[in-house]
Amino acid sequence: MSIAADPPPEDAPRVSRRGRPARYTQDDLVAVVAQVFLERGYDAASMEDLARASGLTKSSLYHHVSGKEQLLRLAVNRALDALDGVFEDEARQADSPVRRLEHVVRRTTEVLVAELPYVTLLLRLRGNTEVEREALERRRSVDARLAGLVQDAMDAGQIRSDIDPRLVTRLLFGMVNSLVEWYRPGGHSPHGPAGGPVAPTVPTSRDEAIVQAVVELALDGLHARRD
């Protein structure tokens, strides 16, 4: 999908008011919108703010979306779809329960690194709108699926069973989700350059080391105790 600003004169370069390309894909637009929501807050951000940040007019923006609720849904669904994909992939794993659990912890951490602005936005939702409530319900489903994996590994005697699986789930996601507070890809802001789309995150050796540290800390602490 391509989203264009109002057409300039034929001999004018195709740039927006701020010097950015006047033609956006939907992913480009959602990246800019996510940045504005993170910086201003969803409730405080207006369609005027979103149009100004994207270099579109409000009328052009409304031509392609019904309002900021739709844009919020597109942004948080990017995170949720990636998380759902982790569990769809896990369901195809034929390994032991603890290996499937390790796979999910690793992949959810990789998703957070790759989709940092969108996961950050998801974690800031408070359920004030229908879109937010729908997203939070999907997030609870992700929590429940992880809890099921934890229980399976406990039942198989592969991780310690003296801790409530629901608490284990909260602690695992708490460790992973805490990355949004301090992790910065390449040492830069996770929200992209001011007024521009969030650049895709390319995994680095540092990213891989962080992912591995999360997996090892989580799983080493859960290993079944041997008398």
Regions found by a protein language model. Name each.
Residues 1-16, 110, 114, 143-156, ...:
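C-terminal peripheral helix-coil segments that are non-catalytic and often amphipathic
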Residues 103, 109-151, 155-158, 166-169:
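Short secondary-structure transition hinges
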Residues 1-40, 44-56, 69-73:
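Basic, helix-initiating cap at the start of DNA-binding domains
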Residues 74, 85-114, 165, 169-172:
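Hydrophobic alpha-helical connector segments
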Residues 65, 73-79:
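Alpha-helical DNA-contacting segments of helix-turn-helix folds
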Residues 59:
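Key DNA-contact positions within bacterial/archaeal DNA-binding proteins
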